[in-house]
UniProtKB/Swiss-Prot annotation:
HAMAP family: Asp_tRNA_synth_type1. ATP binds at residues 221-223, 485, 537-540. It is found in: Cytoplasm. Keywords: Aminoacyl-tRNA synthetase, ATP-binding, Cytoplasm, Ligase, Nucleotide-binding, Protein biosynthesis. Gene3D superfamilies: Bira Bifunctional Protein, Domain 2 (3.30.930.10), GAD-like domain (3.30.1360.30), Nucleic acid-binding proteins (2.40.50.140). NCBIfam families: aspS_bact, PRK00476.1. It is an enzyme of class 6 (ligase). InterPro entries: Aa-tRNA-synt_II (IPR004364), aa-tRNA-synth_II (IPR006195), aa-tRNA-synth_II/BPL/LPL (IPR045864), Asp-tRNA-ligase_1 (IPR004524), Asp-tRNA-ligase_1_N (IPR047089), Asp/Asn-tRNA-synth_IIb (IPR002312), AspRS_core (IPR047090), GAD-like_sf (IPR004115). The gene is aspS. One of its GO terms (cellular component) is cytoplasm. This is Aspartate--tRNA(Asp/Asn) ligase.
Length: 592
């Protein structure tokens, strides 16, 4: 017989009745029923109920053993009586009558309960993560993560992609977030950087003659944390040669659709090809470049209904040509109480308020200050244009859309959530396309790159030479699911002349480009194929599939929101000897 087990704790069935077995695992729960002790024994695979009688050798050990101690038992599989069968367990038709028991590892008093999964402070959960990971939900999430990565890898290989690894120690890059720097002992005063993404290396692989690359790549960014962002994360890094934007979409859509169908527990997934929404349309309709399409609300520009009179405040705002009035429909939100709550919410968001019109049963028509000023005829025309009628409401935001669009998008989300318009039981995908190549900086009084400086502008060099920078759009795209940006991608700028001109428009001379990106630029001078790619985030994909709201719930050993590893006590101080070897002298910040 094997030293520790003949079966796992999730394996035994009624067909095993009468078998002599050996099991090892954790004491999940212990119950004393009139002399007989019942133990739920747990391992990675499941639970098995044990029955220990006073005559069993080691019974006194079992009486005093704590939860989460590790034990080994020998015993016989017996069928449970009909009234004690547990239909919720795969092993629920049997139990093991223990003949011998040995404690392999006794547990101390637990700082964190495993059974029952009560809510517990995150700092305790992270400090004792090995206990937290024993809890069913988190354990299942980490298994799901492994399965999702296996599925992604299989689907990519089936499409002819090859998996390569790129360097972890690389050069610091000026674009994007802050780098994590690693001092070089062999080269004093110089530093490596941990990669924010394998961006330049994957492009160099295409220049090297490879055609389809992927990698489950670790990435590191020294940036502010939030629920769906971490200092270290993994992404499905992808690059392809001789492709258009459509080719990239056609390659990745079956992977995303397949993975979400496989692990989405029956929730409908957007069929591919996924909808494509131009960036400016997404901002105008949803107030966001990562819209949640489960929310049916679409905002509309209703400036013409207010221009020149009616509601004086909006009319005055519209005298400035750059301003607009946007409407946020609120189907079935037609009550003063709901409108007042929305107005209070807006004030809590730092806004002066939120204009509204609502259906008033008392008046038998539209109510609210805006309706009163517009008059019945204009108000009726406005609400009909929004597709609204009895029982509905509409909310209004006025000013410069560049300033208010994020707030308008948040109001759309708030209305959809509070009115329960969002279908939680589905995965809605879309592409956001046609991102602006450049944006004007009022602070610096110049154009700069809106997003990725290495994207190919639509129209290439001709567009850069003959269009206003603010009108140029890039072959850049994001994939969005349920309001979460899963990745960004682009068709790359593989031509040195186009790249240098793009950087020139953004205020960077050729000497700066050569200094900071000379390696890649020089490679492009030796024959570079048109290429493009993207990089969906593994953590966010698993978070959505697991139904979690924070990526820490799908990472085995995450950092907390202050960027600390409470289990391993990182970051930590290092010895003076280590600093000396690296030629580093510390200059701590002076406390005020």
């Amino acid at each position: 017989m094997h030293l520790y087990r003949t079966h796992t704790c999730g394996q035994l069935r009624a067909s095993d009745t009468g078998s002599k077995v050996r099991l090892s695992g954790w004491v999940h729960r212990k119950r004393d029923h009139g002399g007989l002790i019942f133990i739920d024994l747990r391992d990675h695979y499941g639970l098995t109920q044990l029955v220990v009688s006073p005559s069993t050798p080691g019974f006194d050990l079992v009486e005093h053993v704590r939860a989460e101690s590790v034990i080994r038992v020998d015993g016989e599989v017996v069928a449970r009586s009909a009234e004690t069968v547990n239909p919720n367990l795969p092993t629920g038709e049997i139990e093991v009558v223990v003949r011998q028991v040995e404690v392999l590892s006794e547990a101390a008093e637990l700082p964190l309960p495993v059974f029952g999964e009560p809510e517990y402070p995150e700092d305790i959960r992270l400090k004792y993560r090995y206990l937290d990971l024993r809890r069913e939900t988190l354990h299942r999430n980490i298994v799901l993560r492994s399965q999702v990565i296996q599925s992604i890898r299989r689907r990519m290989i089936d499409q002819g992609f090859l998996e390569f690894q790129t360097p972890i120690l690389t050069a610091s890059s000026p674009e994007g977030a802050r780098d994590f720097l690693v001092p070089s002992r062999l080269h004093p005063t110089k530093f490596y950087a941990l990669p924010q993404a394998p961006q330049q290396f994957k492009q160099l692989l295409m220049v090297s003659g490879f055609d389809r690359y992927f990698q489950i790549a670790p990435c590191f960014r020294d940036e502010d944390l939030r629920a769906d962002r971490s200092l270290e994360f993994y992404q499905l890094d992808v690059e392809m040669s001789f492709v258009t934007q459509d080719d990239v979409f056609a390659a990745i859509e079956p992977v995303m659709h397949g993975v979400f169908t496989e692990f989405g527990e029956g929730k409908p997934v957007t069929p591919y090809p996924f909808p494509r929404i131009p960036y400016r349309e997404a901002i105008a309709k949803y107030g966001s470049d990562k819209p949640d399409l489960r929310n049916p609300i679409e905002m509309q520009d209703v400036s013409e209904h207010f221009r020149g009179g009616g509601f004086g405040l909006f009319a005055r705002i519209l005298e400035d040509a750059k301003n607009a009035v946007w409407a946020i429909p609120g189907p079935k939100g037609g009550s003063r109480a709901f409108c007042d709550r929305m107005n209070s919410w807006a004030q809590g968001e730092g806004q002066p308020g939120l204009g509204y019109i609502f259906w008033s049963d008392d008046q038998g028509g539209w109510g609210g200050p805006i309706a009163k000023n517009l008059g019945p005829e204009k108000t009726d025309g406005l609400m009909k244009a929004l597709g609204l009628g009895q029982g509905d409401a509409a909310f209004f935001v006025a000013g410069d859309p560049k300033v208010f669009y994020k707030f308008a998008g948040a109001a759309r989300t708030k209305v959809g959530t509070d009115l329960k318009l969002i279908d939680e039981g589905r995965f809605e995908f879309c592409w956001i396309v046609d991102f602006p190549m450049f944006e004007w900086s009022d602070e610096e009084k110049k154009y700069d790159f809106s997003h990725n400086p290495f994207s190919m502008p639509q129209g290439e060099l001709d567009a850069l030479l003959n269009k206003e920078p603010g009108e140029i759009v890039a072959y850049q795209y994001d994939i969005v699911c349920n309001g979460h940006e899963l990745c960004s991608g682009a068709i790359r700028n593989h031509r040195p002349d186009v790249m240098l001109k793009a950087f020139e428009i953004a205020g960077y001379g050729p000497e700066v480009v050569e200094e900071q990106f000379g390696g890649m630029l020089n490679a492009f001078r030796h024959g570079a194929p048109p290429h493009g790619g993207l990089a969906p985030g593994i953590d966010r994909i698993v978070m959505l599939l697991a139904g979690e709201t924070a990526i820490r719930e799908v990472i085995a050993f995450p950092l907390n929101q202050q960027g600390q590893d409470l289990l391993m006590n990182a970051p930590s101080e290092v010895s003076e000897k280590q600093l000396k070897e690296l030629h580093i002298r510390l200059a701590p910040p002076i406390k005020a």
